[in-house]
């Protein structure tokens, strides 16, 4: 019956899919038609369903599915039929999977035309001998169609195209990231919310509402926030508690930039070591950056505010030219902390009992 396992982190991508429905007495013909309808968008070419009996007498169902385009799903329950949940695998050798399904079936149904595997990287069986050597395009097309993960994709390329793999690895890694993007986990904020103990909370609240908490027209530009003050006053914890963000400390590393972040944080980085400071402070969109050890890329598809945190001894404004300072003040709310201010409220102590 349907499994209760979580859908998180599940991913399947392949043009050849092998399904096993345990303890499933479903009619193979009915199951074939239901699975066929589920994958219409990927252009199904062939499906084989067979009912088989276990030694204990229980029935289970096997299915081999072949599509023109790779089936790409992230829902582990996608192939559930009539409450029965299958084990979903990539059929790396369709010939062997088909032979396995047809070994001892009680009932069989198939639709479409079976496509024998002609993969150059699995070796050649007697029925797959080809005099003509496959081209690089054919090899890559086959790898793209049958790889099920980033690691498998790169491993196949290394095996079949070793010279290209050794000289163009960064390009293959780039295509692997596009084919198999990482599944984003649901954001859980590790930083507890805090209430600033400031002389002028209103100015911070006035900045928070339109720039962090409220969605705005994509054409409008946000405004950044600059906070300068003593260390150990809770600036970083407060800034990081507001939501999903890009966080940089010591240096700005664009290689892990998250487009889904609501805002950026530049924490304790001297002004002279902050590249693209104008783009960050000005909440600009679609600008080019050059990640270390990576290729140039365009980031920030929409206007995104930046919170800049600095200690008094590295005040950015002291390092700026008059022209830079004018730009900074026009695009940034500036908050200079007063003595005694903190970005968290002091704990409320219980009243002491009189002795």
Curated annotation (Swiss-Prot):
Keywords: ATP-binding, Covalent protein-DNA linkage, DNA replication, DNA-binding, Endonuclease, Helicase, Host nucleus, Hydrolase, Metal-binding, Multifunctional enzyme, Nuclease, Nucleotide-binding, Nucleotidyltransferase, Repressor, Transferase. A motif (RCR-2) lies at residues 60-62. Residues 175-187 are annotated as: Oligomerization. The active site is at residue 100. ATP binds at residues 229-236. It holds the Pfam family Gemini_AL1_M. It is found in: Host nucleus. Its EC number is 2.7.7.-, 3.1.21.-. One of its GO terms (molecular function) is helicase activity. Homooligomer. Rep binds to repeated DNA motifs (iterons). Forms the O-complex, which is a Rep-DNA complex involved in the initiation of RCR. Part of the C- and V-complexes which are RepA-Rep-DNA complexes involved in the c-sense and v-sense transcription. Belongs to the geminiviridae Rep protein family. There are 3 rolling circle replication (RCR) motifs. RCR-2 is probably involved in metal coordination. RCR-3 is required for phosphodiester bond cleavage for initiation of RCR. This is Replication-associated protein.
């Amino acid at each position: 019956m349907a499994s209760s396992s979580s859908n998180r982190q599940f991913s399947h991508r392949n043009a050849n899919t092998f399904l096993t429905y345990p303890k499933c007495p479903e009619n193979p013909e009915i199951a074939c038609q239901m699975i066929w309808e589920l994958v219409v968008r990927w252009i199904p070419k062939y499906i084989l369903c067979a009912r088989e009996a276990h030694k204990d007498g229980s029935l289970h169902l096997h299915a081999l599915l072949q599509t023109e385009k790779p089936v790409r799903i992230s829902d582990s329950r996608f192939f559930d039929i009539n409450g029965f949940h299958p084990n979903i695998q990539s059929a790396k050798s369709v010939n062997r999977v088909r032979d396995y399904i047809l070994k001892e079936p009680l009932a069989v149904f198939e639709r479409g035309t079976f496509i024998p595997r002609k993969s150059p990287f699995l070796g050649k069986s007697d029925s797959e001998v080809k005099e003509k050597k496959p081209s690089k395009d054919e090899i890559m097309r086959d790898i793209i169609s049958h790889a099920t993960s980033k690691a498998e994709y790169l491993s196949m390329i290394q095996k079949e195209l070793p010279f290209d793999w050794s000289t163009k690895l960064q390009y293959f890694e780039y295509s692997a990231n596009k084919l198999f993007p990482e599944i984003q986990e649901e954001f859980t904020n590790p930083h507890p919310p805090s209430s600033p103990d400031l002389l002028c909370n209103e100015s911070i609240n006035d900045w928070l509402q339109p720039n962090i908490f409220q969605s705005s027209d994509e054409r409008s530009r946000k405004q950044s926030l600059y906070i300068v003050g003593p260390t150990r006053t809770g600036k970083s914890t407060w800034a990081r508690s507001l939501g999903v963000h890009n966080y940089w400390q010591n240096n700005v590393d664009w290689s892990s930039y998250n487009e889904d972040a609501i805002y950026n944080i530049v924490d304790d980085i001297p002004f002279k070591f902050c590249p693209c400071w104008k783009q960050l402070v000005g909440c600009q969109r679609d600008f080019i950056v050059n990640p270390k050890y990576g290729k140039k890329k365009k980031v920030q598809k929409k206007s995104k505010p930046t919170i800049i945190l600095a200690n008094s001894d590295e005040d950015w404004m002291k390092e700026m030219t008059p022209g830079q300072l004018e730009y900074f003040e026009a695009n940034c709310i500036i908050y200079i902390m007063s003595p005694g201010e903190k970005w968290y409220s002091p704990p409320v102590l219980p009243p002491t009992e009189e002795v």
